Amino acid sequence: MARSVDSDVLVIGTGGAGLRAAIEAKERGVGVAIVSKSPAGMNNATVVAGGGFRAAIEGLTPEEHYRDTMEVGKRLNDPKLVRIFAEEGGERVLELRRFGVEMRVHHGGVSVGTIPTLRGLGITKPMVKHCRSIGVEVVENVVVTKLLKKGEAVVGAVGYDVHVGEPVVFSSKAVVLATGGAGALYKRTDCPLRVTGDGYSLGYHAGARLRDMEFVQFFPIALAEPGEPPFLIGGAITEEGRILNTLGEDIPKKYGLTARPLVLKSRDLLSRAVMMEIAQGSGVSGAVLVDAREVFRRRNVEYLAYTGPVKYLLEKLKAAEKPFRVAPICHFCMGGLVMDENGYTGVPGLYAAGEVVGGVHGANRHGGNALTDITVFGARAGASAARRSRRVKAKRVEELAEAEIRRYEVLAARDNGYNPYIVMERLREAMWAKAGIIRDSASLAEAFEEIFDLRGMAERVMASRGRDMLVALEAPMALDAAEMIVRAAMERRESRGAHYRSDYPLEDQKWLKPVIISEADGGAMHLTT
């Protein structure tokens, strides 16, 4: 027996974009439900973000913010979206204080959070609390696997409660997708393992178009010591320290990287340079070195506290005494659903916001822009969904969910088959090795073949426990997202921003256009430019 959740607006995802959309819709006087496949506000990219918002605040002008964003995005961004983003960003970021978010204001943005590796909790925790206080219905531990359509319109969704072990059917007049990106498709990532690209798949199968899926951003400097967490390293440690190969060569100097701060303005170039050094044999077990000994001698710990897990580096790794290993890590997806300035995807009833959307960041993202993005377009998508919910009537959706519920039942009853964790592990290995920072035609073809093989395995997985069921239901959606990344990377025969092909190493003005993905009649993935 399925549980029913009815609302005017359904928001899928409880990261910053989803929470902001839910608050905006609720404040406009409509009934709102928000669903998360984990505890609300947890296991999303917002939580592990560095806590920095870049916006037109304290001296940075909207025009400067617009120009920087377009430049870093290699002008593949949608200029209309970027203009709104730059002009509204400052006000929207400061507005978070109204929802209980504490922040430190500085030139060009704000910073939040106090836990070095989980600064984003300073965003999601108070916003979840605010959602509950204003009457948003919060549904937790439910993985949504399909959007329900009546005719051309999205009228709800269906998912599975992995704690209780029952289907959940959502009826709504409008849906906001805010499921985040797909960083967990890669072996090395700072994203939680639940960031598996669900929204790309959900939107795609509901008829939405996607763009820029080939552009996956890798943070260039993250801890790569054996057995240690892959913490991001930035700030003074990377700007004032030395990033070295085994020959003692300074890698940024060797590759002529001068834009500063490196990890904000040159993420793609530095990531590529590090991986080239590793590929050429000038690394250490898949890593290079950061020598921050002089930094720790000159700077006090309080100054360095915002640059990464300083206490961990000093006490566990003895970073004041010797260099430590680092390597790039998958951090963000620039591509996603095509939307207009109000979060509308072109599918009636379906809106989107946050990392699941493409167009704002173009070919590469400027550091600090992701969190500003979720506030600006989360609010806009929530407002648009609320407006639609006032002018349409609710539809009965139970019959629309029947086929998906039967799929859950078959999966739960299967007593032999493949382990879903193995499917996801193989996918992450393939994406890291074949569709990561340095790509070419051959490696992408190998990644595509692996995805094809894994699809067959994913159809025959078994899931005897709730957590197994979660991974089993994530796997087909993750494979959709992975195929989009690989297919788009195969299509774009140039190098631009975060997309680098060693067989097409130069930027080509003919490719100053997005690769668009849609589902063709019969279910095939269709690409156009």
Language-model-derived ranges and their functions:
Residues 68-91:
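Dinucleotide-binding Rossmann-like beta1-alpha1 core, especially the glycine-rich loop
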Residues 38-68, 231-233:
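Conserved N-terminal glycine-rich FAD pyrophosphate-binding loop of Rossmann-like flavoproteins
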Residues 5-7, 16, 24, 28, ...:
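Glycine- and aromatic-enriched mobile tails/lids
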